[in-house]
């Protein structure tokens, strides 16, 4: 209001509002939102960023907020996801991301209970792509094949599960196509997922957001997580991503690079080409400011061709040539 201008090198930290004062007083940086909840609501605010279902949409919001880093928290995947969706769009809320189907409670009882399921768009949100998938491309593996009937219940029609089973994604797609082509009246088949780690469709890689730090603490120290979900058991509570232009590599297929985080966790970042081009966010030498580093070169799986990428290549958006 008094015409104060930030210096050119200043930047914002994009995080959920409850991190704002910590960022200000502990990190001495500028939060994009805080408990006063500036820049929080609407499709162009922090809530809109985390629930955006395309990287382009998320990147545009971050650019508007002048963000350089993004802090994600496992709570945004669990309890706070609904709050983010409502802050982003109070009319639609969680409708694009979660649905409800009904099942019998302890058959042969006729009592019906709700079974929440995730939609494909849930897995495309920025918060899931960053915190759960580390920004890497993910292909669906195991999904739930469900046959359900339309049933009248308390004056309305609801979907009630008749049959459900775990199948691989390819088999599931064929089964719903076959069933729905000749389904009896009032019967339908869908694919569903009830786990945050199991998408229903391929989730593309993020090209401009790279993991630079993760907390030593696992999310399981603070949240109840099934012991059978190995991926979530090793999920870190907090992660920090840096926004970068990314280096361009010309090629077709899938490119990958092995990475090790500051906690010693290993994962592989994969990306599928778009129009004969990859835009990659990690350097092959050195490491990120928070200690995430590559342990090998970029490799196009289909050709075996390798690429070395410097941090300057990533930060300046350069085109990189291959090594063979």
Predicted regions and their residues:
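Extracytoplasmic
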Residues: 1-324
């Amino acid at each position: 209001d008094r015409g104060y201008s930030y210096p050119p090198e200043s930047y914002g930290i994009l995080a959920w509002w409850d991190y704002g004062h910590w960022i200000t007083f502990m990190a001495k940086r500028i939060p994009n939102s805080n408990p006063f909840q500036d820049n929080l609501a609407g499709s162009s605010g922090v809530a809109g960023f985390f629930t955006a279902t395309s990287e382009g949409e998320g990147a545009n919001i971050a650019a508007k907020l002048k963000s350089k880093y993004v802090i994600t928290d496992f709570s945004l995947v669990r309890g706070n996801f609904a709050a983010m969706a409502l802050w982003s769009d109070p009319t639609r809320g969680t409708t694009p991301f979660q649905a409800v189907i009904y099942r019998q409670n302890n058959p042969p009882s006729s009592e019906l209970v709700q079974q929440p399921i995730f939609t494909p768009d849930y897995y495309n949100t920025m918060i899931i792509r960053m915190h759960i998938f580390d920004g890497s491309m993910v292909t669906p593996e195991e999904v739930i094949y469900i046959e359900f009937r339309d049933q009248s219940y308390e004056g309305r029609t609801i979907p009630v599960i008749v049959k459900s089973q775990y199948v691989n994604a390819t088999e599931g797609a064929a089964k719903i196509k076959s069933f729905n082509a000749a389904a009896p009246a009032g019967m339908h088949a869908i694919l569903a997922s009830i786990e945050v780690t199991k998408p229903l469709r391929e989730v593309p890689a993020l090209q401009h957001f790279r993991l630079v730090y993760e907390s030593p603490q696992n999310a399981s120290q603070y949240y109840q997580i099934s012991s059978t979900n190995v991926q979530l058991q090793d999920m870190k509570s907090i992660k920090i991503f840096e926004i970068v232009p990314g280096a361009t590599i010309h090629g077709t297929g899938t490119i990958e690079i092995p990475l090790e985080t500051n906690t010693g966790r290993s994962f592989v970042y994969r990306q599928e080409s778009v129009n004969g081009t990859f835009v990659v966010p990690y350097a092959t030498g050195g490491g990120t400011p928070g200690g995430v580093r590559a342990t090998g070169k970029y490799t196009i799986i289909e050709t075996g061709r390798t690429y070395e990428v410097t941090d300057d290549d990533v930060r300046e958006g350069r085109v990189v040539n291959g090594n063979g």
